[in-house]
């Protein structure tokens, strides 16, 4: 899975992460951070903070609590996105309201014994 993540990061600036709770969204972002020479031990889930920024290299957004398009503007998400080299967005609600291009969507479903991965390029 780590190698898949890195190959996608070479092609896309923005990776949208759509999957269940506890399926590994933040873990994948930690792998991505490691690839960018960011200490993966400092990468945390942004669920309650909306976003975590790691220098200008990586922006990690969780849109779980974004309830309206207005929330995107109120949180300055488009400005934040334009200031970072790579962006990982968990649960990308209202994605059409974000000023983004060059992205890929990774959907992961948890099964009792495995994870099912779909990549939408």
Question: Where on the chain are the PLM-derived regions?
Answer:
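Conserved lysine of the Walker
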Residues: 25
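N-terminal pre-Walker A segment at the start of P-loop NTPase domains
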Residues: 1-9
